[in-house]
Amino acid sequence: MSELTIFLRHLDEHVLKGTGMGKPAKAKRGIPSKVDDFNAWYPFIVEAAELVDKRYPIKGMDVWRPYGWKAMRQIDALTHSEMDRTGHEEVNFPLLIPEDLLEKENALVARLKRAREEGVDPDELRDEDEEAGFKKEVYWVKHAGENDLDIPMFLRPTSETAMYTMFPLWIRSHKDLPLKVYQMVNTFRYETKQTRSFIRVREIHFFEAHTAHANEEDATRQIEQDLEIVDRLMDKLCLPIIKAKRPVWDTFP
C-alpha cells in the first residue's frame, strides 16, 4: 500500500490549519503552490507537517518524526484489523536472505520473462544465466566482523523469496490450506534515481500478505477478498480509489 497516497489527502489540513478553505497562502505562509509547482510544494509540505526528516546521513533513508509515525501506526492498526477479520496470521521473517535463494529467484524470473515475451509455456524453456529480479537493487552483507562470509547475504527488498522457502515446510497436505500470512517490516532497495520521501526511498515501511491455496477457485476467491479489504481500508481513510487490472506487460513475471 502506498504511503504517499495515504498521507497526501491530510497534509494541507495539518500544515495550513487556520488559512481557510482556499489555496495555500503563498505570500502569507511562504508555501509553494501545489498546482503551479508540485515538485517544490511536496517536499515543503512533508517537512512542514513533520512527517519525516530526510536529513539523515544516508540518502533515501528518512527518519520518521512523531506525528508521521503516529499516523503510520494508526494506518497499520487498521490493516491489522482487516487481516485479523479475514483470517490472516501475522509472521515476522528475518531481515537477511542468503544469496543462493536470490539466484534461484533470478533464474526463474528470467525464464518467466522470456516465456512471456516469446509467448510460450515457461516449461519449454530452461533457466537462463542472465541477471533479473532484484540482484542489482539489493544491499549486500559480505563480511561479519573481519571475516568474509562463505555465503553472502542481502537485506530483503521484499519477502517472496524468504517466505516461499518456508511454505513447503509448513504445507504438508491439503489440510494445511489455505495458508494466509502477512507481515509489516522494513524492506531495502538500492534506488539509484533521485529519492523523494514516500515516493522513492531506500528503506520502506512495508506491508505484504501472501497466501497459498488448494485450487484456482479458492485463489480467485482470495483475490476478490483482497479487493474488499482494499475497499474497506480506503473507505476508513476517506480515500477514493480506482481498481484496475494490470496489463500483462506490466505484471511481475
What spans do the regions from the language model cover?
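TRNA-recognition modules of translation machinery and tRNA-sensing kinases, especially anticodon-binding
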Residues: S2-P253
